[in-house]
Amino acid sequence: MNTPYEDIYTLFYDRVINDKRFFLTGILSQEEAEDIARQRSKSLLLESIVYIQTYGTKDCEVNFIGDRDDDLEEFTFELSLVEKQLIADVMLQKYLEKDITLRLNALGQVFEDSDLKVFSPYNDIKYFNLALTELRTLNDTSIDRYKSRDRESFKQKISIFNYEFD
């Protein structure tokens, strides 16, 4: 059975539900906002599966990149809940990585040099960066764990001299 991208979008939306900037609430019509959120989600999903597929030295048992149909917006195999959650978590990371750039640009446009001497947004940016770094670390650990387990049984693979056994 195939897995629609929508299954993963829903998990991702749960992570950013309060972010009005992602959903553009109050700015566009409901339909326009949903279309843009869907386009952004698809872009983040594609970035995320490339990241998961290419991260680290271990191979994935499945081909997230090749085994998908972008026209039908679905993977051509059934993803496990672990895989769906992992992709949604990396989507959040990719979204926040873009968000930090937007925040820095916005601060540069809002504050004059004299304002920055009185009010420094450094702490806000510092804590945002720390949280993003922690999320990256958690996601990278999750990817390593995912790749070190059998996809069907979720049992740990045993690696001896770079040979893997089930």
Segments (PLM) and residue ranges:
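Conserved short "hinge" loops at termini or chain/domain junctions
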Residues: 1-79, 145-166
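Short, solvent-exposed secondary-structure capping/transition elements
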Residues: 57, 61, 96-108
